[in-house]
């Protein structure tokens, strides 16, 4: 014989906590280790967004990310086409590796960003600096690539160690973002 259970309504009162503070994120430290156009812009856009939202933003560039903050390369970054699975997925790697294709892809990307009124890299750094953001270069990577303070954009505040970088991130409400 099968027993049946009576259905009884279940009611419960659940208190939902009300957020007293606007946000717990007070500052961001964005570490950029890559020097491709899309990675550098991701870091710049996130830092700018944090600053516009009233948060502190600091950028730390290391290894190939240093290309983004050198006077020589800042406005000449490229989009990686070979080995980038997100770049036109249906395109064979052979086509993406053809001479001139990376330059063409970078040109098209910059053209689309220009349509959206996204500033060039050096102008973006100037905006971030003017809004109170701070830009740093990694000491070890700078030494490895034989770069000096004079090689970097004027907006680069200093060349610092990894320990110094962690000190920048110290405190409650601090978030590290690695690109």
What are the language-model segments listed below?
Residues 104-163, 167-168:
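A charged, amphipathic interaction segment
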Residues 2-21:
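Positively charged, low-complexity intrinsically disordered leader regions
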Residues 29-40, 69, 112-116:
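Short, glycine-rich nucleotide/cofactor-binding loops
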Residues 173-179:
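A hydrophobic membrane-anchoring alpha-helix module
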Residues 65-78:
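N-terminal beta-loop-helix "entrance" segment that forms/cooperates
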Residues 57-63, 136-139:
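Short internal beta-strands
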Residues 77-109, 113, 117:
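A glycine-rich helix N-cap at a beta->alpha junction
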Residues 41-54, 59:
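Histidine-anchored nucleotide/phosphate-binding helix
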């Amino acid at each position: 014989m099968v027993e049946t259970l009576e259905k009884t309504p279940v009611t419960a009162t659940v208190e939902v906590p009300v957020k007293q503070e606007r946000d717990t994120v007070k500052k961001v430290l964005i570490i950029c280790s890559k020097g491709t156009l899309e990675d550098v812009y991701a870091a710049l856009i996130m830092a700018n967004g944090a600053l516009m939202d009233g948060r502190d933003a600091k950028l730390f560039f290391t290894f190939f990310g240093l290309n983004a903050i050198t006077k020589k390369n800042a406005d000449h970054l490229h989009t990686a086409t070979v080995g980038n699975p997100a770049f036109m997925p249906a395109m064979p790697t052979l086509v993406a590796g053809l001479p001139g294709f990376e330059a063409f892809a970078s040109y098209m990307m910059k053209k689309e960003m220009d349509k959206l009124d996204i500033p060039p890299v050096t102008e973006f750094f100037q905006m971030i600096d003017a809004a109170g953001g701070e830009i740093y270069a990694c000491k070890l990577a700078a030494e490895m690539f034989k770069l000096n303070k004079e090689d970097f954009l004027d907006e680069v505040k200093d060349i610092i160690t990894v320990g110094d970088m962690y000190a920048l991130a110290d405190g409650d409400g601090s978030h590290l973002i690695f690109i």
